[in-house]
Amino acid sequence: MNLELVENIANAVLYEGYMLYPYRASSVKNRQRFNWGALAPESYSAAQKGTEACLMQTECLLQGDENTTFDVKIRFLHLVLREIGELETPLDELPTDSEPEFHFVPTLDVGGQLYQAWQEAIEREVDLPTLDLNVVSETKKFSIPTTRTLEPLRDENDKIVGVIVRTQQKIEIVVSCQLSVVSEKTYKLTVRVENQTPFENAETKTREEALLHSTVSTHTILSTKNGEFISLLEPPDELSEAVAACENIKTYPVLAGIEGEKDCMFSSPIILYDYPQIADESQGDLFDGGEIDEILTLRIMTLTDEEKYEMRGVDDRVRQLLERTESMPEEHLMKMHGAMKGAAKSKGNE
């Protein structure tokens, strides 16, 4: 398995929808984010009558023998509420045993830098222990605790005039894996991810509140040694019925890595083809796959100074996107303009 190829695709899915054009926190589009792979607490899903998922299931076929092992990795974003506080009185240092007196504000300009309330994200991944084909089932619960931190904001006189308050809510997920025999040396592998985070009074809560207790952009990476996964898109004829019986919920697995190798499955909330790749013309994450890279880049280049000022204040990822675009050489922009590529072969066009 070429880990770099798989991780490039996985990271593109992980941050799809993280920030949408026009890349400003104040835009309407960015008040409704993270529609891919969001698993809400079970109680909130029930309150929303299933319109918000709490469960993701991957099913695929694995061929192997007594020497075959496989690994299960779940990756997602954990949202962090970022609030901005303005101190009532400037301080030299933050107190160590309590919080200073402050009030929350939507934005705060400190030393020419804009700080604004937002939802940041932390990358998370959890793994089951390496399994073999003798294991009928494996279940593991993962818990991430609630945390709250304060980051001081200093003015040009080195006085603390504000704080960034970051609050991460508790998340509890259960990952289970089941193996069943399809035929000699062929097995059905079922991996379920469930959000079992306690979430009281769910019927009165907003989606934004629920997202803080959710796994976002959730996806599964399956890898095997001494075994082979079967393509669900183009299975061999003798396994077509077994593939059709696979039930995938809120996700779909495809072969990933070097084309032709069958040791990795990437199960994504965004439907992909086998062996997905990042285009050579791509210069980095734009977070908005619903748009064309060239058009997004040109739009960023034409933002006003005020719009760029707000964009820089979102977070480091968005600031890096702006800086990368502003410094992009003309030849890189021309590469995005167009390229002739051959069609991938499949059973349908051979």
Residue ranges of predicted features:
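Extended, highly charged accessory segments
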Residues: 53, 64-350
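Hydrophobic alpha-helical segments, principally membrane-spanning helices and signal/leader peptides
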Residues: 1-2, 289
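N-terminal ordered "arm"
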Residues: 3-65
